[in-house]
Amino acid sequence: MSQTAKVLLINGPNLNLLGRREPGHYGHQTLTTIVDELTRNATQAGVTLEHIQSNAEYQLIDAIHATDAQFIIINPAAFTHTSVALRDAILGVAIPFIEVHLSNVHAREPFRHHSYFSDKALGVICGLGAQGYDFALQAAIKHLSDKH
């Protein structure tokens, strides 16, 4: 795989509160800890990992429009169930992506069961906590290496 392979990691609203927000659903790890570990794993695989977390939808859309990444890992958080604009941004750049959720959204409130992203995602990982991000990164690396 090329040394220039790049993955964009997108985290949506309220994920900046990981580690203290509803740890029963989201775990005790902070977003910084998760991203640091993923960055190390990506670097070891020869992949660059870029990360954005925002509570503002437009900032996530702008990051998608501006990226030169070949793969996206996205935890849209609450935007999962509401954001046609974020979905359209990903479809507009035609970059393959995996959707990740820390909690099992299907075992939670009914409004969390619908995703505007799942039908277009290469895959969806939910309910495995922070480990889901690592599985998504492994799948992204495999996908990128298969293409080269």
From Swiss-Prot:
Substrate binds at N75, H81, D88, L102, S103, R112. The record marks R21 as: Transition state stabilizer. InterPro entries: DHquinase_II, DHquinase_II_CS, DHquinase_II_sf. It comes from the Bacteria. It catalyses: 3-dehydroquinate = 3-dehydroshikimate + H2O. Pfam families: DHquinase_II. Its EC number is 4.2.1.10. Pathway: Metabolic intermediate biosynthesis; chorismate biosynthesis; chorismate from D-erythrose 4-phosphate and phosphoenolpyruvate: step 3/7. Keywords: Amino-acid biosynthesis, Aromatic amino acid biosynthesis, Lyase. The active site is at Y26, H101. GO terms for biological process: amino acid biosynthetic process; aromatic amino acid family biosynthetic process; chorismate biosynthetic process; quinate catabolic process. One of its GO terms (molecular function) is 3-dehydroquinate dehydratase activity. Belongs to the type-II 3-dehydroquinase family. Homododecamer. This is 3-dehydroquinate dehydratase. It comes from Shewanella frigidimarina (strain NCIMB 400).
